Amino acid sequence: MKLILNKEELLDKYSRRKAVEEDIEQQVRKILNEVASSGDEALIEYAREFDGFKGDLSNLKVSEEEIDKAYREVDDGFLNSLRKAIQRVFDFHQKQLPRSWFTTEENGNILGQIYTPVEVAGIYVPGGTAAYPSSVVMNAVPAKVAGVKRIVMVSPQKGERMNPYVLVAAREAGVTEIYRVGGAHAIAALAFGTKTIPRVDVITGPGNIYVTIAKKLVYGTVNIDMLAGPSEVVVIADSSAKPEYLAADMLSQAEHDSLASGVVITWDGELARKTAQKVEEYLKLLPRREIILKALENCGGIVVVDDEEEALQLANQLAPEHLELMLPNPFGYLAKVKNAGAVFLGQFSPEPMGDYLAGPNHVLPTSGTSRFYSPLSVDNFLKKSSVIYYSQEGFLADARDVIKLAETEGLFAHALSVKVRISNE
């Protein structure tokens, strides 16, 4: 396996990684249409076909008793760590809460903006090659902080029952109901509603390509957070960085799935060589070795560039989900970062700290979309409404201007709405 690449070789890998087969979208459209028209009947058939679900509609929803049982199966260490993570995520997202505001003009007009939470939020939690309690936390906690009263979680059941760690995380994070269903059919159920699963106002959370395309297609029927793709990290490092750290950080992303990306960019050829050696060494120790190998082959590597400016330019071009600056005085480079979902500064801020415990959200824009998308936040679960109050004095001061503008646009009923109020005063 070739690990040390030039810039062109890496960009070629990235371009091939972004290619999406058109027939997948057609399959997803069919699933969405059938769930929209047939509801639970189509949903349960797809759950059996794609999720391996063996039950019926009566046990599609996870019971409180099953969650109680899950608590007895998880260890105290996990529960303590989970609660610490939830508190840190809660504290961070609470700082994001915007305030409604009003301003009063001299003539008595009152203008303002108010924020209200959506009524029902749907969160998608993957259940593929691994279980992700952390994804539950990162999706549910911002919704709870925003004030959402009903948080509906969907996640495919693998095996005879739901993962107990995921169930415990859901209750601890404030999820109000859980359904054992995944894939595009779960997104369809959340978007259109069925007799069993309620229609939601917003859908958040990452998934596979089918989930991502489904979210793209239902956008407009409901709101979504973003179109999340495979996980990725780019690490910029100089000779002060430890090869052990760089190799481990590459591998931590590559183990997600075969399309995940772990990239190191450096202008130190010797550091690149030593990092490649450490990657080979660590690979022998990891249980998800085959997944990692495919990921590195598909979209990973160590790129040697001329200098730090070229490294930053390449990183901004890639616009990664996670960017690590493993450099002396990393804060000095922060202003040069234009595109990244999250930025990790220094030797002791590896990406997994953000995945689990730091506090900022780990649901981040991928596949170059950090050029225009932002991390999941309380904003995804809030709506803004403008508030307008005119006093009589304020109305009369502005009325003739409104009439002129409305008539210029040919909207004479708009002008009439103002004129009748003038004539009655």
From Swiss-Prot:
Binds 1 zinc ion per subunit. GO terms for molecular function: histidinol dehydrogenase activity; NAD binding; zinc ion binding. GO terms for biological process: L-histidine biosynthetic process. Transmembrane segments: none annotated. It catalyses: L-histidinol + 2 NAD(+) + H2O = L-histidine + 2 NADH + 3 H(+). Keywords: Amino-acid biosynthesis, Histidine biosynthesis, Metal-binding, NAD, Oxidoreductase, Zinc. Its EC number is 1.1.1.23. Zn(2+) binds at residues 253, 256, 355, 414. CDD domains: Histidinol_dh. Its cofactor is Zn(2+). Belongs to the histidinol dehydrogenase family. This is Histidinol dehydrogenase. It comes from Carboxydothermus hydrogenoformans (strain ATCC BAA-161 / DSM 6008 / Z-2901). The gene is hisD.
